[in-house]
Amino acid sequence: MYDNLKSLGITNPEEIDRYSLRQEANNDILKIYFQKDRGEFFAKSVKFKYPRQRKTVVADGIGQGYKEVQEISPNLRYVIDELDQICQRDRSELDLKRKILDDLRHLESVVANKISEIEADLDKLTRK
C-alpha cells in the first residue's frame, strides 16, 4: 500500500499530516509535512520537485493551429492520490471524534436533566 510514497523514500506514510502543492516555473513543488513530535516547534517536512509535462494540442477545433500546454506529471498525480487517501482518512477520523464528543456532551445533559427530575420527584414525596 502507498507504493508511490514508498518509492519516494517515505517509509511511514501513516505519519503524514498534510501536504502542499505549488507551481514554480516549469516545475510542480510537492511538500509533505509529517506529524510533530512532542516538544517540537516545527513539523518535519520533505520537498520534491516534478517537471511539468509538456503536450502539443490542437489550438482550435478546426485543426489548423497547435499550442503547447503544460500539465501535472502522471507520477505526481499518483502520489497526490495516495496523499489524498491518507489526509482524507485523517479528516474522517477527526470528524468521527468530534461526533462522538458531541454525542457524549448531549448524553451528559440528558442524564443531568433526568437526575434533576428524579430528585424533584423525591422532594415531592418527602414533603408529604
Curated annotation (Swiss-Prot):
For this protein, the record's InterPro entries field holds: UPF0325
TM helices/strands, residue ranges: none
Query: Could you say which protein family the record assigns here?
Result: Belongs to the UPF0325 family.
Record's protein name: UPF0325 protein YaeH
Species of origin: Salmonella typhimurium (strain LT2 / SGSC1412 / ATCC 700720)
Q: Where is the organism placed in the taxonomic lineage, from the top?
A: Bacteria, Pseudomonadati, Pseudomonadota, Gammaproteobacteria, Enterobacterales
